[in-house]
Regions:
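Non-catalytic, conserved peripheral segments adjacent to functional cores
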Residues: 2-138, 158-195
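Conserved metal-binding segment of the jelly-roll/cupin
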Residues: 135-158
Length: 195
């Protein structure tokens, strides 16, 4: 049953992609994704493992092999590929960004991240779903985030965290929307989860 107007914040429409944030009545972290093939993973999000090759000198890891896997399929012919890195201090929250056109490809290279994903796509079967994915040094995964999926993170632990990411187009501020970390409709619990 579609959400009522009072339960939705419209975020815009472009290229047949309509986005809206659905009110979440209970503060939570949504579905925690523990396996790349989880049935709760938001549709269109892809997770792949990163293999580290350690030896006595350190380790080597391939971050992306463009066009060689499901995660990077189609990027080999991309004329506007951009590679960036973000470094964040412990406890930093970079709240939700979303795009109408841009696809993000993330791989952590240092530290640990609590990644938050929210399906903002009105026509998605998972509209309103929220995922939490812990990734980084202790869970080396690559992540593909399609247009219409809000994404953000919190750095967990005591170390600086670094994220390398590809985008399938150059940064365009007109393609990006943002939601504050404490948005009442998102109702995400950023606090440590004591169990």
């Amino acid at each position: 049953m579609p959400a009522s107007v009072e339960e939705v914040v419209p975020l815009g429409e472009r290229n047949d992609l309509q986005l809206a944030l659905v009110r979440r009545p209970t503060k939570s972290i949504g579905d925690v994704i523990l396996q790349p093939d989880s049935p709760h993973l938001i549709e269109g999000v892809i997770i792949e493992g990163v293999t580290h090759h350690p030896d006595d000198r350190g380790y080597f890891a391939e971050l992306f092999r463009v066009g060689a896997s499901k995660l990077t399929a189609g990027l080999a012919q991309c004329p506007t590929l951009q590679v960036s890195v973000a470094a964040s201090y412990p406890g930093t929250i970079k709240a939700l960004h979303y795009h109408f056109e841009q696809t993000d490809y993330w791989v952590p290279i240092q530290g640990m991240f609590q990644v938050v994903l929210c399906d903002l796509r009105i026509n998605s079967n998972m509209h309103g779903a929220v995922n939490t994915i812990y990734l980084g040094l202790l869970r080396p995964w690559r992540l593909k985030i399609p247009p219409g999926v809000g994404h953000g993170y919190k750095v967990v632990g005591q170390d600086l965290a670094m994220l390398t990411y590809l985008t399938d187009r150059f940064y365009n501020p007109q393609d990006e929307g943002r939601l504050p970390y404490d948005h009442a409709f998102l109702n995400y619990d950023w606090e440590l989860q004591h169990k």
